[in-house]
C-alpha cells in the first residue's frame, strides 16, 4: 500500500515537520538567491547533472592561424585544455519563528518564509566565495585570497586618483590575457565611483546603464563586502561557475536551543522556553 504525498496547500506545517519545499516556493527561493547574489549575477551557471561532483574540460587557449606560402608546411596549432572540478556542499540556514506559524499551511508558510531563506542563502554563499567566510572549501580558495596570493591587488591611492587605480586594476586582469567583464562592490562605493573621471574630465560611471569603464556592476550588501579587505573586485567572471545539486529540504524543531542565534537578552534562543520553533 502506498501513501500519497501530501498537498502542501492543505497540510499544516505542524503536521508536516520535515519534507521538501513545495516546487513553486523552492523555485522562488532559488530565483531570489540568483537575483540577489552579487557573485551569481556575474558568474555562469553550471548544470551539475544531479551529481555532487562534476568535472568538465574548458578551453584555456584556442587554436592559432598561420600565414603560409605555396608548398610550405602548415604549422600544427596547439590548443590548451584544462579540467575543472566542481564539488557541492550542503548550505543550511536556521530561522526562528513564533509557534503561531505552525498553524499555517506548508505552502502559505513557505511563501512567507521564502525571502528570509533566500537572503540567508545568498549572503552565506557570497561571503564564502568572496572572502572565505565559514567556507567549507577553506579561506584560501576565496576570490580575495587567491587575488592576494597572486599579487593581483591595487591599494586605493596608489595612482593619481581612483580612475588611475581602476585602470591599473584592469591591467592586472589583462596581464594574464583575460578580458575584465564585471565589477563587484558595495553600494557605499557608489559615491566614489561618481567622482571617477578620465584624463579629459569625462565621468566614467554611468548610473543609467549601471556601468563603470564599460564594466557592468554587481552590488553586494553591506554584510557581505569586507571593506577592510577589498572595496571592489574586477575580473573575467566567465571563469566563475556555480551549480545547484537538488531541491531544498526543511525540518521543523520545537525543543532545541539555538547556540548560534541570540535573543534580546544576549543569550542563546531556547525554543521551548520562548514558545518558538526553528525552521
List PLM regions with ranges:
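Assembly/oligomerization interface modules of large self-assembling protein complexes
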Residues: 3, 13-93, 162
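Active-site-surrounding "flap" and adjacent substrate/cofactor-binding loops of secreted or lumenal enzymes
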Residues: 9
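Short helix/loop capping segments that flank catalytic or ligand/cofactor-binding pockets
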Residues: 63-67, 105, 192-195, 242
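Active-site scaffold segments
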Residues: 117, 276-279
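Bulky hydrophobic/aromatic "packing anchor" residues in well-ordered structure
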Residues: 55-56, 95, 217, 279
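Short, Φ-rich (hydrophobic/aromatic) sequence segments
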Residues: 20, 24-34, 38, 109-113, ...
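Extended oligomerization regions of viral-like shell subunits
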Residues: 152-277
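Alpha-helical scaffold segments that mediate packing/assembly in large oligomeric complexes
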Residues: 82-85, 92-172
Amino acid at each position: 500500500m502506498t501513501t500519497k504525498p501530501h498537498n502542501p496547500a492543505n497540510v499544516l506545517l505542524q503536521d508536516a515537520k520535515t519534507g521538501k519545499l513545495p516546487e513553486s516556493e523552492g523555485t522562488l527561493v532559488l530565483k531570489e538567491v540568483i537575483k540577489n547574489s552579487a557573485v551569481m549575477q556575474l558568474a555562469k551557471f553550471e548544470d551539475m547533472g544531479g551529481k555532487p561532483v562534476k568535472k568538465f574540460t574548458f578551453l584555456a587557449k584556442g587554436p592559432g592561424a598561420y600565414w603560409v606560402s605555396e608548398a610550405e608546411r602548415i604549422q600544427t596549432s596547439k590548443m590548451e585544455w584544462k579540467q575543472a572540478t566542481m564539488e557541492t556542499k550542503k548550505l543550511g540556514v536556521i530561522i526562528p519563528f513564533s509557534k503561531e506559524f505552525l498553524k499555517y499551511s506548508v505552502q502559505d508558510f513557505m511563501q512567507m518564509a521564502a525571502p528570509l531563506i533566500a537572503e540567508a542563502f545568498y549572503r552565506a554563499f557570497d561571503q564564502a566565495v568572496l572572502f572565505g567566510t565559514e567556507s567549507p572549501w577553506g579561506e584560501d580558495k576565496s576570490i580575495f585570497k587567491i587575488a592576494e596570493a597572486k599579487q593581483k591587488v591595487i591599494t586605493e591611492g596608489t595612482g593619481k586618483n581612483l580612475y588611475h587605480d581602476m585602470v591599473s586594476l584592469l591591467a592586472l586582469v589583462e596581464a594574464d590575457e583575460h578580458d575584465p567583464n564585471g565589477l563587484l562592490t558595495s553600494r557605499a562605493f557608489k559615491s566614489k565611483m561618481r567622482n571617477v573621471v578620465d584624463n579629459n574630465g569625462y565621468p566614467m560611471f554611468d548610473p543609467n546603464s549601471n556601468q563603470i569603464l564599460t564594466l557592468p556592476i554587481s552590488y553586494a550588501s553591506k554584510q557581505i563586502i569586507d571593506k577592510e579587505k577589498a572595496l571592489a573586485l574586477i575580473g573575467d567572471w566567465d571563469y566563475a561557475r556555480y551549480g545547484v545539486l537538488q531541491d531544498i529540504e526543511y525540518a521543523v524543531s520545537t525543543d532545541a536551543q539555538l547556540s548560534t542565534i541570540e535573543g534580546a537578552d544576549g543569550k542563546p534562543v531556547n525554543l521551548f522556553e520562548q514558545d518558538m520553533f526553528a525552521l
